[in-house]
Amino acid sequence: MDNFLALTLSGTTPRVRQGKSAGFRWRWLGHGLLELTPDAPVDRALILSAGIHGNETAPVEMLDKLLSALYSGSLTLTWRVLVVLGNPQALAAGIRYCHSDMNRMFGGRWQSFAESDETRRARELELSLETFFSSGQARVRWHLDLHTAIRGSHHLRFGVLPQRDRPWEADFLAWLGAAGLEALVFHQAPGGTFTHFSSEHFGALSCTLELGKALPFGQNDLTQFSVTSQALSALLSGVETSTSSSPPLRYRVVSQITRHSDKFALYMDAQTLNFTAFAKGTLLAEEGDKRVTVTHDVEYVLFPNPAVACGLRAGLMLERLP
């Protein structure tokens, strides 16, 4: 199964759906779904996902290179792994999504969207995670969902962590720093993301990794993310990564800007970078007689997007943590 990406993009079902490779067994579970199980018993399970948005290709290329290293035997596997290429049709078309944003649908939220390929895929991925985690006895469960951002950013690589009732484990946060993430953003409320679903329903330590800017296949400079790729290789092979000399900055979400109607106006232009700072009192958005302003001394914007569908998030506002 050294052609997993090509099969996924072409929508082709492989003639052989399972087999053995260098120290592990593999099973093709469906389009964009591949399970890897080491020959030796392990108590760690990892979801490695990318391509939830079809125009975010750099992480997909990174995963393809990692799989090639595993199949060639140059990389040893020490985790049970489920590799997920989230939205095969959008990946093949080179578009963010075909109908609706899948990363708003998880945790059963797909039921509130008009039925589409994305709603069916979100349901399929939920069931795939259920099967994967229930079929093993993993003591450690991680989910790394690899993305790229629509906009540029003051932090080239950053992580977004779902709301979690329990404290985050130090070794997980340390690994994120070792993977080159310059900032970590902590959600304070539930959401429909893939990582919130895996964290809430399966207790996984989950993070959305944002790695640079969305570009078409073949146009990515993967050297920008070599530190992340090296950290993933070390993780898969069970090699401890060195702690980052400069730990990631930490932010928490303090508010969400939501577009409710066509009267919505977001006062940020196309050049506004993620993590741009705004001073207290700054007018951020208006919708009819409703005004959204900065309420803390300084707030930072994340994922500003005035063109979202009504009812969806047009941006997050953050505050820096000590």
From Swiss-Prot:
Q: S-adenosyl-L-methionine among the record's keywords? A: no
The UniProt keyword set, sorted, is: Arginine metabolism, Hydrolase, Metal-binding, Zinc
Q: How is the cofactor bound?
A: Binds 1 zinc ion per subunit.
Residues the entry annotates as binding Zn(2+): 53, 56, 147
EC number(s) per entry: 3.5.1.96
Keyword Hydrolase among record annotations: yes
Biological process (GO) annotations held by this record are: arginine catabolic process to glutamate; arginine catabolic process to succinate
Q: Which Gene3D superfamilies match?
A: Zn peptidases (3.40.630.10)
Q: Which cofactor does it need?
A: Zn(2+)
Which pathway features in its UniProt record?
Amino-acid degradation; L-arginine degradation via AST pathway; L-glutamate and succinate from L-arginine: step 5/5
Molecular function via GO: hydrolase activity, acting on ester bonds; succinylglutamate desuccinylase activity; zinc ion binding
Q: What family does the database annotate?
A: Belongs to the AspA/AstE family. Succinylglutamate desuccinylase subfamily.
Protein name as catalogued: Succinylglutamate desuccinylase
Originating species: Salmonella newport (strain SL254)
